[in-house]
């Protein structure tokens, strides 16, 4: 009912036209989608502009689109990329909102119950709500998500039904309006005003919707809305004056009072059945445990309308039958939406594996009286359920997996790069003397201001090689799994800027990562078969050198394995196609020129330091409270901007700095507690 308020078409803002294999791929994908095909593989070599191809396709088809990536970092990169493609349309980001998550679990062997423990990232939570709000109010929506999109979410019909529009001139009493906000699970807080709260000041009501960054001020004249204003949440400055505003629930699990009453009746019935089961089996401890916990949750739902862990009762709240799949993000899309699975060789198996792990954990909780059996139905979709809901799917990968290849009636190939760059030349060298040979090759690249990636099989070998190269005078660093995202970004930035010439690691795939300065990828012990030396891993690793005009890959091996041969044959096939095209069209390969910030702009700005100049100049014992508060407001504004740009690590860094300042300078004397954010 709200979708006529927004445009229905996508408008692509590209600085260039389709080139290379892109026009052919766009045409073929469009034809196959419009003819009704449900599974299509886009086999795109590294650097051929697969994301741009999908952007042009979305503009042509004008359908809501879900893009699934296999981790948050890649999802953020894609969201940032598509926001640049579609600045006038809704490009949303939907991932898990937990910075830290320990699910509820029970270990029977040690009789250990682990309480749910989680740290929620409020900025990511806002973006999740904005994604569902956009899907319910407009057609021109692209949502970039992780597997979070297959996990249980409240019913979209209830979420939509609960939302309402406030307009200037509307007759509504302040009391009724406050009741509506409370029913939508917004909290009244006249002091600590933050997202998800509302406050009252005379005839003025202010609310920060969970999916917005601004404050909505509703000015009343008696029982009539006189003005609707949008304000900056920190400064209070006027951003705009509106004719009306949409208010959606503060929780995806909101439901009507009638539904909740019915659900509570059903929960009590199931509880009694389960208690009889435990008592028949003389499991009195389990019975008492379940009764105490469930009755407590029911009392909270009756009094407040919700409880902690209410999602475990979602089957009853939604009115679903036992075993019926839960609602999830997919149910918020229109029926004709398009799904794009990025790096499908990784993402498809990931989607398929979520259900089994969740079931195993929940089963132990149910059997030992910590949860009702219906809690098992608060789960991710199994793969068949996912496949039934997504309709038409495009699988995107340089190395498609067996599943997607078996489902697709032939692949759409995108081999030719718009830049004219060809796949790297591959050379196989003997293992004997590989380190000395590698050192010589590194020195050659150093003279040309080029960079090198080296992949090893073991952590120990990577560490020893890093030490050896460092002693030999090479600017080298070791990239390993213990390095956090920000430090990883700093190392990659240092590599691109030339502060580091070589990166050594075990798994340097990082699909989707652009390192145009890398001209050599060295694969040590290439003939040791395993998942790090599989055909897929080889092709992905080879792709790290495909963005340089002089890209080469050196495989150190004494034997030619099947995986090596397949990856070499496929790379050479692509290389021949690319070279033939360049000769025929008179194309000269052009080096990729990409600013260093482009690779990391979603995660962090290079050498980004929080501005603490004010703090450095303040004498600690006699701190100026007003100055500190002013500085905190400035940092909060920067944090909101960083989160809006999907730079969540930067936003988190700012958040931690704000928390530290509040604890150090603003905590009340005698208080041992933490300042609530």
UniProtKB/Swiss-Prot annotation:
Keyword Flavoprotein: no
Main location: cytoplasm
Record-annotated disulphide pairs: none
This protein's record includes keyword Signal: no
Recorded superkingdom: Bacteria
UniProt entry keywords in alphabetical sequence: ATP-binding, Cytoplasm, DNA damage, DNA excision, DNA repair, Excision nuclease, Nucleotide-binding, SOS response
One GO molecular-function entry: ATP binding
Subcellular location(s) of the protein: Cytoplasm
Domain UVR: 629-664
InterPro entries listed in its UniProt record: Helicase/UvrB_N (IPR006935), Helicase_ATP-bd (IPR014001), Helicase_C-like (IPR001650), P-loop_NTPase (IPR027417), UVR_dom (IPR001943), UVR_dom_sf (IPR036876), UvrB (IPR004807), UvrB_inter (IPR041471)
Motif (Beta-hairpin): 97-120
Ranges where the Helicase ATP-binding domain occurs: 31-417
GO CC annotation terms, alphabetical: cytoplasm; excinuclease repair complex
GO process terms (BP): nucleotide-excision repair; SOS response
Residue numbers binding ATP: 44-51
CDD domains: DEXHc_UvrB (cd17916), SF2_C_UvrB (cd18790)
Residue span, Helicase C-terminal domain: 434-596
SUPFAM superfamilies: C-terminal UvrC-binding domain of UvrB, P-loop containing nucleoside triphosphate hydrolases
Subunit structure of this chain's protein: Forms a heterotetramer with UvrA during the search for lesions. Interacts with UvrC in an incision complex.
Domain free text: The beta-hairpin motif is involved in DNA binding.
Function recorded in the entry: The UvrABC repair system catalyzes the recognition and processing of DNA lesions. A damage recognition complex composed of 2 UvrA and 2 UvrB subunits scans DNA for abnormalities. Upon binding of the UvrA(2)B(2) complex to a putative damaged site, the DNA wraps around one UvrB monomer. DNA wrap is dependent on ATP binding by UvrB and probably causes local melting of the DNA helix, facilitating insertion of UvrB beta-hairpin between the DNA strands. Then UvrB probes one DNA strand for the presence of a lesion.
Similarity comment: family membership: Belongs to the UvrB family.
Name under which the protein is recorded: UvrABC system protein B
């Amino acid at each position: 009912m709200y979708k006529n308020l927004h445009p229905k078409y996508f408008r692509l803002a590209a600085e260039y036209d389709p080139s290379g294999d892109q026009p052919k791929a766009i045409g073929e994908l469009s034809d196959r989608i419009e003819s009704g095909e449900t599974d299509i593989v886009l086999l795109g070599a590294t650097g051929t502009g697969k994301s741009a191809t999908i952007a042009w396709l979305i503009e042509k088809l004008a359908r809501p689109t879900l893009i699934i990536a296999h981790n948050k970092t890649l999802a953020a990169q894609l969201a940032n990329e598509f926001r640049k493609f579609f600045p006038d349309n809704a490009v949303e980001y939907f991932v898990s909102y937990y910075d830290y998550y320990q699910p509820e679990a029970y270990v029977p062997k040690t009789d250990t119950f682990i309480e749910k423990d989680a740290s929620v990232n409020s900025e990511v939570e806002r973006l999740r709500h904005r994604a569902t709000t956009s899907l319910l109010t407009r057609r021109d929506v692209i949502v970039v998500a992780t597997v979070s999109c297959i996990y249980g979410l409240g019913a979209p019909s209830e979420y939509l039904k609960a939302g309402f529009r406030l307009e200037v001139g509307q007759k509504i009493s302040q009391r009724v309006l406050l009741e509506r906000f409370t029913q939508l699970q917004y909290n009244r807080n006249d002091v600590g005003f933050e997202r998800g709260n509302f406050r009252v000041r005379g005839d003025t009501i202010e609310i920060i919707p969970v999916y917005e960054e601004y404050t909505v001020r509703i000015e009343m004249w008696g029982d009539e809305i006189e003005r609707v204003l949008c304000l900056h949440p920190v400064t209070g400055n006027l951003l705009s004056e509106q004719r009306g505003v949409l208010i959606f629930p503060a929780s995806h699990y909101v439901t009507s009072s009638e539904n909740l009453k019915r659900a509570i009746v059903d929960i009590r019935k199931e509880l009694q059945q389960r208690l009889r089961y435990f008592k028949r089996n003389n499991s009195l401890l389990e019975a008492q445990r379940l009764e105490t916990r469930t009755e407590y949750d029911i009392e909270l739902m009756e009094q407040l309308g919700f409880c902690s862990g209410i999602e475990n009762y979602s089957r009853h709240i939604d009115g679903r039958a036992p075993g019926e799949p839960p609602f999830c993000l997919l149910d918020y899309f229109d029926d004709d939406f398009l799904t794009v699975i990025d790096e499908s060789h990784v993402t498809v198996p990931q989607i398929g594996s979520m259900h089994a792990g969740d079931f195993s954990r929940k089963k132990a909780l149910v059997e030992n009286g910590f949860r009702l059996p219906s809690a098992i139905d608060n789960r991710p979709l199994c793969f068949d359920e996912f496949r039934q809901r997504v309709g038409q799917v495009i699988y995107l990968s340089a190395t498609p997996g067996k599943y997607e290849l078996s489902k697709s009636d032939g692949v759409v190939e995108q081999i030719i790069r718009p830049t004219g760059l060809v796949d790297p030349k591959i050379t196989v060298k003997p293992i004997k003397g590989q380190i000395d040979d590698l050192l010589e090759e590194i020195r050659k690249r150093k003279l040309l201001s080029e960079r090198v990636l080296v992949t090893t099989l073991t952590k120990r070998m990577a560490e020893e090689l890093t030490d050896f190269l460092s002693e030999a005078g090479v600017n080298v660093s070791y990239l390993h799994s213990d390095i956090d995202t920000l430090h990883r970004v700093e190392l990659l930035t240092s590599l691109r800027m030339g502060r580091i010439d070589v990166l050594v690691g075990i798994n340097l795939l990082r699909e989707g990562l652009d390192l145009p300065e890398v001209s050599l990828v060295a694969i040590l012990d290439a003939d040791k078969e395993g998942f790090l030396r599989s055909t897929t891993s080889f092709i992905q690793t080879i792709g790290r050198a495909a963005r340089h005009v002089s890209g080469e890959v050196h495989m150190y091996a004494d034997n030619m394995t099947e995986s090596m041969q397949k990856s070499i044959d496929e790379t050479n096939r692509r290389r021949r196609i690319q070279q033939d095209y360049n000769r025929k069209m008179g194309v000269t390969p052009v080096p990729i020129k990409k600013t260093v910030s482009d690779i990391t702009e979603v995660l962090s700005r290079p050498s980004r330091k929080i501005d603490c100049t004010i703090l450095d100049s303040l004498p600690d014992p006699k701190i100026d409270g007003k100055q500190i508060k002013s500085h905190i407001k400035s940092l909060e504004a920067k944090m909101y901007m960083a989160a809006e740009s999907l730079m969540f690590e930067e936003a988190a860094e700012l958040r931690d700095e704000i928390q530290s300042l509040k604890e150090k300078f603003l905590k009340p004397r005698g208080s041992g507690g933490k300042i609530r954010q």
